[in-house]
């Protein structure tokens, strides 16, 4: 069994305009400021190295995912594709649900500040939503512990 983490960037791992003393700056080549708190960087690196755990990007910022992977460095196993949603369904939600359907015996965790937009009546039993609760508009240490403890 694998634990998949579907990970968003904006206001999930990278708070908007974050400039804290622990900020790890990501060069975006002129596409705006992007910084990730050190505690999140360290946790994500550890998560990605553990056996039977896999990070998949859940964002439409593909250029930034490449920069994050190169600069931290970090191993991500893929990116969700936001295409072909059913009519009237948020394309990101459709991709998340499709991923969970494709991995029915695994734990799928979506960490995204927009998870509250998902229709909860359409969620599968193996899909867990983590909405960041940190004061800086990012995943808190408690959120990260919750992810670690999900089986």
In which residue ranges do the predicted regions lie?
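Short intrinsically disordered terminal tails
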Residues: 1-2, 151
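Alpha-helical substrate-recognition element adjacent to the catalytic core
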Residues: 2-90
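C-terminal cap/substrate-recognition subdomain and adjoining C-terminal extension
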Residues: 63-151
């Amino acid at each position: 069994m694998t634990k998949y983490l579907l990970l968003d960037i904006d206001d999930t791992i990278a708070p908007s305009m974050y400039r804290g003393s622990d900020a790890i700056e990501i060069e975006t080549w002129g596409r705006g400021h992007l910084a990730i708190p050190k505690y999140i960087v360290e946790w994500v690196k550890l998560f990605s190295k553990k056996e039977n755990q896999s990070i998949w990007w859940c964002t439409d910022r593909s250029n930034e995912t490449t920069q994050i992977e190169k600069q931290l460095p970090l191993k991500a196993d893929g990116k969700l594709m936001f295409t072909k949603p059913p009519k009237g369904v948020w394309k990101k939600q459709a991709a998340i649900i499709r991923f969970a359907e494709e991995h029915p015996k695994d734990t799928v965790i979506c960490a995204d500040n927009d998870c509250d937009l998902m229709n909860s009546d359409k969620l599968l039993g193996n899909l867990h939503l983590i909405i960041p609760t940190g004061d800086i508009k990012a995943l808190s240490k408690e959120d990260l512990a919750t992810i670690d403890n999900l089986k």
